[in-house]
């Protein structure tokens, strides 16, 4: 069986990516049902037993910026070794709620960690490995902030300022501009129906 495909969903908090991920998974499962492949859904930070434990620390405990970035990449290495790479080798499809682009956007763009440090970690942890498709849900931080305000217990990223998310969004868009061959940008200000129509178009060409 041919190697599977790796698809990531990205966007600032409040952009709606997680809401649409489950719907996308259902449609993708319908597409691959006759091929004997499975669809694996995962997330970052997290995705493994170790990752889920440390996820709570990363999301809720204040820490040094470089420690934060190192933890993200350490968890990613385990995620790749334990979940992503084995699934792709089996021929399965993997959907991940965030991956490396989030680290460049949040720790790089948002927090200001130098890009060269992140690129060094990326090369060490991933080699040349990248997603086959990254769906970026793009939304103005002011609108995303209104959506996030409904969250009952926001984590320390969700609690960041609009200025932080402006920087994060800008870095996401920079990443997309540098790798247009794997990015699909969706305007999250659209209606759910319009967004799902765009996602259907992506599934059709996978």
From Swiss-Prot:
Q: Which GO terms describe its cellular component?
A: cytosol
Instruction: Please give the Gene Ontology molecular function terms for this protein.
Output: ATP binding; dTMP kinase activity
Q: Which gene encodes it?
A: tmk
Which keywords accompany this UniProt record? ATP-binding, Kinase, Nucleotide biosynthesis, Nucleotide-binding, Transferase
Similarity remark: Belongs to the thymidylate kinase family.
Query: Which catalytic reaction applies to this protein?
Result: dTMP + ATP = dTDP + ADP
Positions with a binding annotation for ATP: 11-18
Enzyme Commission number(s) of this protein:
2.7.4.9
Q: From the Swiss-Prot or TrEMBL record, give the protein name.
A: Thymidylate kinase
Keyword Cell division assigned to the entry: answer is no
GO biological process terms, semicolon-separated: dTDP biosynthetic process; dTTP biosynthetic process; dUDP biosynthetic process
Which Pfam families does UniProt cross-reference here?
Thymidylate_kin (PF02223)
Q: Does the keyword Nucleotide-binding apply?
A: yes
**From the record, what ranges are coiled-coil?**
none
EC class: transferase
Protein function: Phosphorylation of dTMP to form dTDP in both de novo and salvage pathways of dTTP synthesis.
């Amino acid at each position: 069986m041919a190697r599977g495909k790796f698809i990531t969903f990205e966007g600032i908090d409040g952009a709606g990516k997680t809401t649409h991920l489950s719907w996308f998974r259902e449609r993708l499962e319908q597409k691959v049902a006759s091929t004997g492949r499975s669809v694996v859904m995962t997330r970052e930070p997290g995705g493994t037993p170790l990752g889920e434990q440390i996820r709570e620390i990363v999301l809720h405990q204040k820490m040094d910026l470089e420690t934060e970035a190192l933890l993200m990449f350490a968890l990613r290495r385990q995620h790749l070794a334990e979940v992503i790479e084995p699934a792709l080798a089996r021929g399965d499809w993997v959907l991940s709620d965030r991956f490396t682009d989030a680290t460049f956007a949040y720790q790089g763009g948002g927090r200001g960690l130098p890009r060269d440090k992140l690129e060094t970690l990326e090369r060490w942890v991933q080699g040349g490995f990248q997603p086959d498709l990254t769906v970026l849900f793009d939304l103005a931080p002011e609108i995303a902030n209104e959506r996030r305000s409904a969250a009952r217990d926001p984590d320390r990223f969700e609690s960041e300022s609009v200025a932080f998310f402006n920087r994060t969004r800008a870095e996401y868009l920079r990443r997309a501009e540098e790798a247009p061959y794997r990015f699909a940008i969706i305007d999250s200000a659209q209606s759910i129906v319009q967004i799902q129509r765009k996602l259907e178009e992506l599934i059709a060409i996978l």
